[in-house]
Amino acid sequence: QYVATTDPEVAYTDVDFVLAHIRVGKLEMRSLDEKIPLKYGVVGQETCGPGGMAYGLRSIPGVLENIEYMEKYSPNAWMLNYSNPASIVAEACRRFKPNSRVINICDMPIGMEHTIARILGFKNRKEMCIRYYGLNHFGWWTSIKDKDGKEYIQDLIAHQLKYGNCLADDDASHYTDSSWFDTAKKVKDIIAIDPTMCPNSYFQYYLFGDDMVAHTDPNYTRADQVVDTREKRVFGECARIEKVGTAKDTTLQIGIHAEFIVDLATALAFNTHERMLLIVPNNGAISNFEKDAMVEIPCIVGKDGYEPLTVGEIPHFQKGLMEQQVNCEKLVVDAYEQHSYLKMLQALTLNKCVPNANVARKILDDFIEANKAYWPELK
């Protein structure tokens, strides 16, 4: 059965799982998230840097509203939340809905693992047993073993130092979108900064911001590309499905994004104790990091929820980067909670993508004007 509705009671009544992925302001606001920082020579990206923080301040009330609907109409349901920017959303959930049945997730590392499995010769990523830690879009793989316990991390490091996260014979023709090929190649530069573990490719925005700005068209950003390609294809097909009332003959294919969230629902429903990468309160899993930080680490998932795996101490370089980033995210949630201009200014000033407080203030003032319909009034 397929039902399309904007009535919360219809949508949320008698459900076991809410698979949530909202975009407050839609792609029109994403375009501004990207273009406003670029005007000042700063990275313009969906979830990283100033754009991600603007998106976060818009997303918080929408995500909280969805949780309230679920708790009203299906109080025993789980919400599996893909809504971005996941770290800021997760911090808001921790702070304002600490007892809610919400699990925040991201498929970006899973997508990289799909390629990593091919690089290392596995049939698929589920043949690998990984160790990973960090924040959302801000982490590192420290171990990749097969089911017999053989370690492959040094093989992956050697490969990434030479090819990035591309196959040895990769070229842009193997990718539906050439920008993802460029992103995979850039891992070669990221891992060279610390070749002891394998980084998430999103570090390109934090560690090589000038390169990203130089190779971005400030008048036609990633949001515009998505509007002109994926949005037309996917939303057009969804509109057709809604009209005919069935997805039987759809041209859309299930990918890693869908597979991962269904695997999580399956683990919760059937107590499979599957090992999955989730965004959860640290609570000492990373022993030398803030206990209340929302970290992305492997967890064992069953009918009662999740159990995080212990990470232990992390090195100074990774810890320093994470402390800077997590406090940017906390300041954004402070700004939402307190309706504080100062807290949002501090968040932008602290962010690694922003060069100084003067630029942070200019970006913030432009964001306030652009987000009048979405942000709380900042005083």
Spans of model-derived segments:
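Internal, well-ordered domain-core segments that constitute the primary functional module
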Residues: 66-147
